[in-house]
Amino acid sequence: MSIYEKLKALDIVLPPVSTPAAAYVPFVQTGNLVFISGHIARKEGKPWVGQLGKNIFTEEGKRAARAIAVDLIGTLHAAVGDLNRVKRIVKLMSLVNSTPDFTEQHLVTNGASELMGQKIGRAHV
C-alpha cells in the first residue's frame, strides 16, 4: 500500500506548505536528505494555544502533535514531490509547552511519532 493510500485510509488530506512566520524556508534539500523547519500546531486554521498541565492535557496535546505531523508530511510532500520516495524519517524533534510539573511530554510527542511510524510506516523515530 502506498503512503497516499494509507493517508486516504486515515482520512488525512495533506495541507499546502504553511507560509513561514519569520525569515526561514519551510525545507531544505541536500543530496538525498530533506530538513524541515519547525511547525506549530493549528486547530481550525489558527494556532493551537494552551499550555500542557495548565489548560490542556495529554490527549489534546497528542491531537495537536498529530496535527503538526500532518503538516510536516504535507511539507515533505512539497519537498520531494512523491512521498513514496521517502525511505525513512531520520529524526523527529518535538518541543512541548508545558508547566514545570507536567511529566507526559513523551506521550504528547507520541501523537506525531505514532502517525509517522505506525500508521504511515516510514519512521524509525
Outline where the language-model segments fall.
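Short, polar/acidic, helix-capping and beta-turn segments at strand->helix junctions
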Residues: 1-124
